[in-house]
Each structure stands twice: as structure tokens, then as C-alpha cells.
Amino acid sequence: MRKIVFKMERPGLVEEGQTVEVSESVTPVNVNYMIEPAVAMSGLFKFNERLKSRQGVVKEIIQNDRGYYVTVEFDE
């Protein structure tokens, strides 16, 4: 299992236990992922760290002074 943390700007867009689809954005240097439809965005990853799966399960949603952070677990 692989976990990735996504930044979400407002609450209630996803729930713990929900299955989500992610899309990949490729730049010349790295890749990042977005929970669709434009719910939350991941940090940057190197090409050799790319996801093999495009579907995951929301495991945790944390709120702090910087916003909402969604942890998604992928089956890889």
C-alpha cells in the first residue's frame, strides 16, 4: 500500500472511506496528482515515483491552520 497526502482548500469535498479517482499532471521535471474533479492536489514527485494506480481510498482528513490534508491509500 502507498499513501499520498493531498492539499484540499475547503471541507466536505471528500469523506473518509470514499474511493477517489486521481489524474496525473506531467511537467518536464516531475509529476503531481489531483483528486478529481479538482478536489485536492498532491505535492511533486519524480518520474520514478509515479503512481501505477489511478484509484485510491481516503484514509484520513486532517485540518490545521494551513488547510485540509487528505491522505489517500493506493493499492500498489
Give, region by region, the residue ranges found by the protein language model:
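Absolute protein N-terminus
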Residues: M1-R2, E76
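Short alpha-helix capping/helix-loop boundary micro-motifs
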Residues: K3-R10
